[in-house]
């Protein structure tokens, strides 16, 4: 009797989260190296806010927890982590100074907000100061991913230096994305100015919105965070005197050749 044909092996669909090479690289610096483990350690109200006493005075309480129980000190030096944390505190206090008065209480970072900003510090430090090593580490992570895949279509091409100047964030609804973006702007400027001079700014900082209503809303939000911001003005955008202003434009006006 003829043998029945072998059943074809069904291709296993790779989980989207497993394809986030940059995310995997960032998590490799920590212990636990997954969000679930970090959440279990940090997601407690007593760890929110700033330390006021002891060796870690001025640091976040998250920093103290990470140093004591979580951080793999062989991967990132503890003094580097301390600097990252102080930068986060500095930027967060700047954008919440006016908001604290409006709210009548001090706004503290949640653990997921802190991790997003901590990862940004690590990324920007590597990008501006250790780019060659960063590129190599990312490609090692990518090669490991490719080796684990059995289907050619799931193979990724190696990172190139020009790929590193773009980064995207994925934050849940209600996670405070607007405030995180404001801190991200300050984080980028901090590293940019450290490399190029304290009084230098990028040619333009542009915030793109989906409509005029959100442009107005973001203008107010940026003002409340202490930024110089304005709705997009083509003449201003060409003038180096306004480089410290954030230009806000809705995407419907990108093709406007007159404005």
Where are these regions (language model features)?
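RecA-like P-loop NTPase motor core of helicase/translocase proteins
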Residues: 2-259
């Amino acid at each position: 009797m003829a043998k029945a044909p072998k059943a074809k092996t069904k291709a296993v669909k790779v989980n989207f989260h497993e394809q986030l090479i940059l995310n995997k690289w960032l998590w490799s610096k920590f212990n636990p190296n997954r969000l679930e483990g970090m959440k279990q350690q940090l997601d407690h109200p007593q760890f929110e806010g700033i330390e006021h006493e002891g060796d870690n005075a001025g640091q976040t309480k998250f920093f103290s927890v990470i140093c004591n129980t979580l951080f793999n000190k062989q991967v990132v030096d503890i003094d580097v982590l301390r600097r990252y944390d102080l930068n986060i505190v500095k930027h967060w206090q700047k954008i919440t100074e006016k908001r604290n008065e409006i709210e009548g209480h001090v706004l503290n970072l949640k653990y997921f907000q802190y991790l997003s900003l901590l990862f940004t510090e690590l990324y920007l430090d590597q990008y501006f100061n250790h780019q060659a090593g960063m590129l190599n580490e990312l490609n090692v992570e990518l090669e490991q991913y490719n080796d684990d895949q059995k289907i050619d279509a799931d193979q990724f091409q190696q990172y190139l230096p020009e790929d590193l100047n773009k980064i995207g964030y994925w934050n849940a609804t209600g996670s405070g994305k607007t405030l995180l973006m404001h801190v991200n702007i300050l984080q980028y400027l901090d590293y940019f100015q450290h490399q190029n001079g304290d009084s230098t700014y990028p040619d333009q900082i542009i915030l793109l919105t989906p409509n005029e209503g959100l442009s107005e809303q973001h203008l107010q939000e940026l003002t409340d965070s202490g930024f110089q911001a304005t709705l997009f003005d083509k003449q201003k955008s060409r003038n180096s005197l306004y480089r410290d202003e954030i230009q806000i434009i809705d995407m419907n006006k990108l093709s406007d050749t007159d404005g």
